[in-house]
């Protein structure tokens, strides 16, 4: 169980995504296009960030699903 807890996201430890784009293939190929500051969500394995300050980061992982929206996680 190799969990890298060095850059733990401050928002929440659960991965989430508001802007998710999927192809119409079977299985679908989904990519989260959310831009986050300084880090990607906790389950992201390929995080690409700009060199600006603060860095704007996008997760480029391809999944066959979308994560739950981040906005709804504040209501429970």
UniProtKB/Swiss-Prot annotation:
Site feature: Reactive bond for chymotrypsin: 51-52
Top-level taxon of the source organism: Eukaryota
Disulfide bridge map: 16-70, 17-32, 20-66, 22-30, 40-47, 44-59, 49-57
GO molecular-function terms, A-Z: serine-type endopeptidase inhibitor activity
One Pfam match: Bowman-Birk_leg
One Gene Ontology cellular component annotation held by this UniProt entry: extracellular region
CDD domains linked to this entry: BBI
Site positions per UniProt: Reactive bond for trypsin: 24-25
Alphabetized UniProt keyword annotations: Disulfide bond, Protease inhibitor, Serine protease inhibitor
Family named by the database record: Belongs to the Bowman-Birk serine protease inhibitor family.
Name of the protein in its database record: Bowman-Birk type proteinase inhibitor DE-3
Organism: Macrotyloma axillare (Perennial horse gram)
């Amino acid at each position: 169980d190799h969990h890298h807890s060095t850059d733990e996201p401050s928002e929440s430890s659960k991965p989430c995504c508001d802007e998710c784009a999927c192809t119409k293939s079977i299985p679908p190929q989904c990519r989260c296009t959310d831009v986050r500051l300084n880090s990607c969500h906790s389950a992201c394995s390929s995080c690409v960030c700009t060199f600006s300050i603060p860095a704007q980061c996008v997760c480029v992982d391809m999944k066959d699903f979308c994560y739950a929206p981040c906005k709804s996680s504040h209501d429970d």
